[in-house]
């Protein structure tokens, strides 16, 4: 018993140790061990196994505790009689059930087989079993409390002790397996979590990187019209519209459709930023530098709703004028400069403004002290004008300049001759040597296209033509051709259509550009402007000296050669004509100058270059090169012009419509040859006329100054020649290009890279009006051609309109002679009409009569008339009846008036060496006509080469119509003095004052 007890005590110790360990590891094991101890009573019978078995079991337990989770080799130490149970236990464990009773039963049966000879112990075991059975429920519920009861039992059964190690082994295995699995699961989960966290972090990093990439910004710098710079940061892939909107928001500008952003692609090429495309794609590798400019010049700035919009337009025009892109006459420079001072400085104050140095302001490309004095003098007369009113007056005068709103592009015709293509609100203009030689109104253009570096326009056939003609031009490169094409598409859409045209639907494998203007049209813009409802925005006007940064600084004589250098795509195209020449263009109604009322209606054939060139030389081969000409034409007083603005358009139209049949008078008959040529109006005839005139006048480098007083007409010699020249140019119809242009029409458009067929949807039927107007102009030139200098200019007016010649001068003179003496009423009417037409803004060249007329400043009294031969004969005059038919004499009637003439001639004893002999080679010839209320001035400029020496001859004829007597001597002296003042570098060779008095009616001497 002692041995048994000792072994049992050892087993208890081991079991208690195992139980403690198990309890530490997991509380559930303790409950399971206690349940095993309270098993069936049969287990106690086997509580006395052989000592060897007990020692083996204790060893097994010890080894089991020491072993790691890899306890798979433990079966080697288990006796054979336990192996089955082990496997069974494992199965049960695997099943995961807590069924330990079957295992205990197996152990008990085996023990009973071996322990049969101990009946007493069996009885004791049974008793204990009964007691244990009673406590079974309590053991399950109170696991922790059973622990002490089990340890206090006096005779625990050996079977119970032996079974504990086996169950513990299996449980430990199960636990270890579970732990291993859990560890693996936890490890896997941890790994997954780690991976997920890492993945999320990586994704977050990538996302943040992407975000930074998407939000990567580029700094943009935009130079504004007042010279300041606006900077902003834009997303790299932002479209042009984003930047444009930011700039307009910064400027507080709502009427923004007239403006755009320019970027410099090359030193000579500027492009408009397309708002519908990404900026990055358009700039490529260029810096993000832009300039804010006017893209579409409003034909009538007075229709703009807000003052701030007009202010920005003023700033743009000041830049254009100061840089030479918008040529002006001296008087126009002075007048516009005075309005600039009034807008920026306010009313003239002797104390405050007397000491201001006007040289700080830039009014013209080449500013002289004389101009500054004139500006200051005119500034005093604007007292009371608010800045907004001054800006409005500035725009009213500037809009009539011939080059207003013209975008010039370099090109060559089919013969390789350098020309310029100008795009404006009315159509496409063709210039050669700074003279406008043709005009294609939008209604006459059927299709615009480009292929590689060629640009084509398909023109609607004329009345007598059966087929359409295509005219081609060669541009410097493909990009220049595409740029010109896009500008044409945009201008046509903006000015002529009611709404933008939708781009063509993409077709499979189609060629050509799909570009279409996507912004608002002028009609839509005006409609939107009427909806603007906000207080007038406050803005500060800046000094005009900012314009000086774009100046050429070229001398007046050379100015025209490079004035356009900084103009996008038109470098050196236009020169700012000498201070006085520009005004001619102002009168041009059609092309360069837009009528306030119906900008698109005029067929205009005038020169755009026209300030100086306003003169149009007829012949295809004769073009005026005025780089060395320094003639200064003064514009008609602006006040007078403004008074007639309201009725100018009507008068012009009426004047053009009336086409009186010209009849030659006595004096004209003597000069039949030139007249006949003039009548023809063709380019060939023009050439002949020019040659004839050249023979008659060119040889001498002299200046003939004739002053005609009281309706006297001066020698027609120079006049007719001038008229003829102009007329040939007039003849060119807008439908036909100059010879070189038309010849290029043969090129085909089959594979045009870009194609655009303008839809002539005009807002109010302006197209029809324009077409009719053009047709009238075309027809008139022929009959009008017959008109002589002295004849009423009305008939000639129509040809002049196209030719832009000095015809007006003639008409005015004749008409006024008759009207002044015989029909005062008619005189005033006609005079007013002519004055309005010619001086419509002192810059506008009336298409009808004065294509080349420049306004004469009211101040300018130099009535210097160029005449090679002063006529002293009876003059037959034709009265021009206004469309209004106010005159008593019908336009078609040719009244013959008896007149008395008186001529005073002054000839300089020194005549230039080359004056007499060889006439030399005629290089250029120009005729400029300007008119004021009572004075008509015609200037003829010819440039010839004799023996390698270049000669410039200026003949100026001034006709003064009035009822009062004029001192001839004083007029002669004044003419000489003014001629010398205007051209100090030239000598006056001849001055003729011719007075013609109508005896029949007035009886004046």
From Swiss-Prot:
**Which segments carry the region annotation Disordered?**
1-80, 93-196, 652-800
UniProt modified residues of type Phosphothreonine: 89, 763
State where the protein is found.
Cytoplasm, Cytoskeleton; Cytoplasm, Cell cortex; Cell membrane
Q: Give the sites modified to Phosphotyrosine.
A: 623
Q: Which residue intervals are annotated with compositional bias (Basic and acidic residues) in the record?
A: 22-31, 111-157, 169-196, 690-711, 754-770, 780-793
Give the region (Hydrophilic) as residue ranges.
502-610
For this chain, the site of the Glycyl lysine isopeptide (Lys-Gly) (interchain with G-Cter in SUMO2) cross-link is: 140, 144
Positions with biased composition (Low complexity): 734-746
User: Which InterPro entries is this protein grouped with?
Assistant: Band_4.1_C (IPR008379), Band_41_domain (IPR019749), Ez/rad/moesin-like (IPR000798), FA (IPR014847), FERM/acyl-CoA-bd_prot_sf (IPR014352), FERM_2 (IPR035963), FERM_central (IPR019748), FERM_CS (IPR019747)
Q: Which Pfam families match?
A: 4_1_CTD, FA, FERM_C, FERM_M, FERM_N, SAB
Which GO cellular component terms, listed alphabetically, does the Swiss-Prot or TrEMBL entry include? cell cortex; cell junction; cytoskeleton; cytosol; extracellular exosome; focal adhesion; nucleoplasm; plasma membrane
Q: How does it assemble?
A: Interacts with FCGR1A. Interacts with TRPC4. Interacts (via CTD domain) with FKBP2. Interacts with NUMA1; this interaction is negatively regulated by CDK1 during metaphase and promotes anaphase-specific localization of NUMA1 in symmetrically dividing cells.
- Which PANTHER family does the annotation name? 4.1 G PROTEIN (PTHR23280), BAND 4.1-LIKE PROTEIN 2 (PTHR23280:SF17)
Q: What is this protein called?
A: Band 4.1-like protein 2
Provide the species name. Homo sapiens (Human)
